[in-house]
Regions:
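Phosphate-coordination loops involved in phosphoryl transfer and adenosine-cofactor binding
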Residues: 3, 69, 147-150
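Structural detector of well-ordered beta-strand residues that form the stable sheet scaffold
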Residues: 7, 27, 71-73, 93-95, ...
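N-terminal glycine-/charge-rich "phosphate-binding" loop or analogous flexible N-terminal tail
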Residues: 1-47
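Phosphate/diphosphate ligand-binding glycine-rich loop within oxidoreductases
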Residues: 46-128, 143-144
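Short, polar loop motifs at secondary-structure junctions
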Residues: 10-15, 55, 178-183
Length: 185
């Protein structure tokens, strides 16, 4: 019996490739840019599974030529690029990775918050340009205090909740908008 073939539209971690390769033949798109839609469609008729990214359009045109497709796996949280109604109609299961970037996105959010409040990008450019050698007012570079400040969060889903957890470490007052009250906030 032939092994199933999976088309992977992005470079993924070696360990993931190794695991998939134990059970399947892999057709890997190795370029940094997303594969063109026509290329996806051209390869669709020879694969049993596809591992996609949000930049790959999995639409009726693709599904029409993907006669052997048994599964779609999205390496992302969102599914806007996949025609879920059509995949469901054809009984092709679609997997995705909910929550996979919630914590790192919250970390990044706090990093941007701190960098903005303390004018880190401006300060870095200022030092690189040698401007630290001239007279300046030192309070200018202190920026705004994050500790004990108030933070507004629009949407208290996975990412918003993770941001709130981090904000608590700074004793920040949290104001948020969400369809449901979050008792832990």
């Amino acid at each position: 019996m032939a092994r199933p073939t999976v088309f992977i539209t992005r470079k993924v971690h070696y360990e993931a490739l190794s695991l998939i390769g134990e059970e399947c033949d892999i057709d890997l798109w190795e370029q940094d840019k997303p594969p063109p839609h026509q290329l996806l469609c051209n390869r669709a008729n020879n694969v049993d599974g596809i591992m996609t990214n949000v930049m790959d359009r999995i639409d009726v045109e693709f599904l029409d030529v993907a006669a052997n497709l048994k599964v779609i796996s999205q390496i992302a949280v969102g599914l806007d690029n996949i025609d879920l109604v059509e995949a469901t109609r054809r009984k092709i299961p679609v997997g995705y990775t909910p929550g996979v970037v919630s914590e790192v996105t919250a970390d990044h959010t706090m990093g941007i918050l701190l960098a903005s409040a303390h004018r880190l990008a401006e300060s870095e450019r200022w030092v690189r340009n040698g401007q630290w050698k001239i007279a300046f007012h030192p309070l200018f570079w202190l920026g705004s205090e994050v500790h004990h400040s108030t933070l507004g969060i629009i949407g208290m889903g996975r990412i918003g909740s993770e941001v709130a957890k981090r904000a608590h470490a700074f004793d920040m007052k949290i104001l948020y908008n969400s369809p449901a009250r979050k008792p832990l906030i």
